[in-house]
Amino acid sequence: MKHVLFGFLLFFTGTISYAQTANTASCSSSKQLKEGVSSGKIEVILPSHLTPEDVASYAKYYEPFFFVDFNSKNHTATFQMVSNTAESRRVILRFLSANQIQTITVDGKSYQLQDFYQNFLEK
């Protein structure tokens, strides 16, 4: 009986811990990100568990706003904006959310998606 209770406790603890893990993407630097926003070619390093199929399956819905080129070797997604406006760049947040990404790290600082947009993509 002791082993069964311990097994359940271990299972539920692991499940809760896994469910609370935030998926985080990152950007090389704020300078590179700002240059990307200006040029309409924004690079984001996605979590390693995302596959090219995952990225492609979500990217197809956002083609009116941007195209996504995904390098599976270094997990870098390059967003090529169709129309480089703040409104179109906001749609990147939908793509990231669809891929279960909740935060983005830039220069060692972690940003929630809305804060990331306000600090980097909106300008």
Give a label for each model feature:
Residues 43-64:
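Short amphipathic alpha-helix segments
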Residues 24-30, 59-66:
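Short amphipathic beta-strand starts and helix->beta connectors
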